[in-house]
């Protein structure tokens, strides 16, 4: 494929006002970065040249690439000085890396769960690289529109969480079991249950955990630290949660009541175990010995 003309990131970028950007939550900002990231990658795959400009150098160094109240442009030259006068706009540029052939490749990819339809051609845009082709084919920046809600890509990324409405707020899905999460952090943590990965290891006994908080809790068993003490009986606990649960035994509180049997429990774990009995759900079992437990915490 012969090399096509040079294009800039701004040719396919979506700009937001300062007010719009401030109203976007973390997941919307990440979605915006991922879409822009795939746009750059697809431009390269189509043969378009991405100039080795100042912003690319900044990207490779992993530096912060946006400031409030101005546009951070990819090419700073006299022809574009007027653009620097724009106020109250933000361009968020994704982090990309350089491979051995000096072409720009994407660090992460994103397949949008919504199918998009381009206004001019009616072509389906199932992911952002197809959106990029549409943007380059037609004149001007026409929006791609979601078939499910009729909102454009720009509106999808704006403060109202249209994409999360389609996916019931869970936009991060496991490709092994299809379980979905609202946050990529929770998805990564869940995937460890498939891989068996336990990155947090105790330096004293070598026991490993999937979460840093579990490691810190375990380390207190070595030090004997029990910072949470009941003011009524003096019993101390490693976790504040265990203290609160213990205090209910003094108060006689039973906050969890089964709507089928009417049985009440002071702890949520007992309530969940009772619920398993009613719905006939198979309790979690040990993969090594086959022994079943009413609670997953007992299995661990």
Swiss-Prot record:
It is found in: Nucleus. The keyword Zinc-finger applies. GO terms for biological process: regulation of transcription by RNA polymerase II. Residues 7-78 form the KRAB domain. InterPro entries: KRAB, KRAB_dom_sf, Znf_C2H2_sf, Znf_C2H2_type. May be involved in transcriptional regulation. This is Zinc finger protein 705B.
